[in-house]
């Protein structure tokens, strides 16, 4: 008698994806973040669903409804902070997942990589709209500043911004539509994540050496299910420490003041995970130039497969490229720090230099170093 999990039309899909999937025998803990992102997404959808049951998307009651969730709803405070800090964990996993892809050359799987970049954009859009919902000072002003950037688009800019706002300023219509989009986008992200996996399973996973591992595969279950479970436990532990001990560590105190369109906060800044892109935006004095740099700072990821000039796939055996990779990581951390600082000397100049270095490393230095390494290895 054949096994049900191998013959049942629905169960066999799950079986081929998570149980009998042939996986390389040498993938390290850096390959854990895919499953962790799946966990984060599920957690965000569930906590978000319970928050949506008590939230009202109206400018007059949005702030009060969040207060009501935290004070009157059973474990409302836990759900709210798990959702807010869950977003931070989501982005930490995302950045590490992308970083692993860059380091080990996973971007050579074109379709998987490009869908991943689209997923990154969608998660950023969802997080931005979610930040607007509590309707605190930073919510309203962050929404105003970021949406107004679209007015830099020639000819249609102003019309586009007013169309997104649903009026002449960020108001009730904006909040309602942001809530609607914030609710629907995670489900679109979940569907795209399945397509991401579909394309990945066409080729099979990459591995740290970057070599073809067809001759040495092991079943996903039990080896990597156990390994992923350890990652899941660590993620939940870190998240719970954050939620239960310092839930506001990564938030902005200004968001505990109800939104007031008549008083501007001294420093308008987005959540920490957008600060690197925000610093790149601010480092260019021209509005349109800044917006283009902001978009290109993420879109540049799609160029990685085209800029890969090395004869080796992974950076594992390429020390010069490794050095540049870690300089790039340090540069991104610097940009994140700059994004949270006021626009004044010396922060502006540091931001400009860090932005130039970011684009230079990706577009020029890494490809040139790859060619040098090819020469050194007589390839």
Swiss-Prot record:
What does this protein need as cofactor?
heme b
Q: What does this protein do?
A: Component of the ubiquinol-cytochrome c reductase complex (complex III or cytochrome b-c1 complex) that is part of the mitochondrial respiratory chain. The b-c1 complex mediates electron transfer from ubiquinol to cytochrome c. Contributes to the generation of a proton gradient across the mitochondrial membrane that is then used for ATP synthesis.
**MF-aspect GO terms:** metal ion binding; ubiquinol-cytochrome-c reductase activity
- Could you share any additional remarks the record makes about this protein? Heme 1 (or BL or b562) is low-potential and absorbs at about 562 nm, and heme 2 (or BH or b566) is high-potential and absorbs at about 566 nm.
State the name under which the record lists this protein: Cytochrome b
- Lineage, top-rank taxon, reads Eukaryota
Family classification: Belongs to the cytochrome b family.
Q: Name one GO biological process term.
A: mitochondrial electron transport, ubiquinol to cytochrome c
One Pfam short name:
Cytochrome_B
State the species of origin: Marmota bobak (Bobak marmot)
| Residues involved in heme b b562 binding | 83, 182
Q: Provide the binding site for heme b b566.
A: 97, 196
The UniProt keyword set, sorted, is: Electron transport, Heme, Iron, Membrane, Metal-binding, Mitochondrion, Mitochondrion inner membrane, Respiratory chain, Transmembrane, Transmembrane helix, Transport, Ubiquinone
Please state where this protein is localized. Mitochondrion inner membrane
Annotated positions binding a ubiquinone? 201
Q: How is the cofactor bound?
A: Binds 2 heme b groups non-covalently.
* Principal location listed in the UniProt entry: mitochondrion
| Record-annotated membrane-spanning stretches | 33-53, 77-98, 113-133, 178-198, 226-246, 288-308, 320-340, 347-367
Can you state the subunit structure given in the record?
The cytochrome bc1 complex contains 11 subunits: 3 respiratory subunits (MT-CYB, CYC1 and UQCRFS1), 2 core proteins (UQCRC1 and UQCRC2) and 6 low-molecular weight proteins (UQCRH/QCR6, UQCRB/QCR7, UQCRQ/QCR8, UQCR10/QCR9, UQCR11/QCR10 and a cleavage product of UQCRFS1). This cytochrome bc1 complex then forms a dimer.
The UniProt entry lists membrane topology as: Multi-pass membrane protein
Q: List GO terms (cellular component aspect).
A: mitochondrial inner membrane; respiratory chain complex III
* InterPro entries recorded: Cyt_b/b6_C (IPR005798), Cyt_b/b6_C_sf (IPR036150), Cyt_b/b6_N (IPR005797), Cytb/b6-like_sf (IPR027387), Cytochrome_b (IPR030689), Cytochrome_b_C_euk/bac (IPR048260), Cytochrome_b_N_euk/bac (IPR048259), Di-haem_cyt_TM (IPR016174)
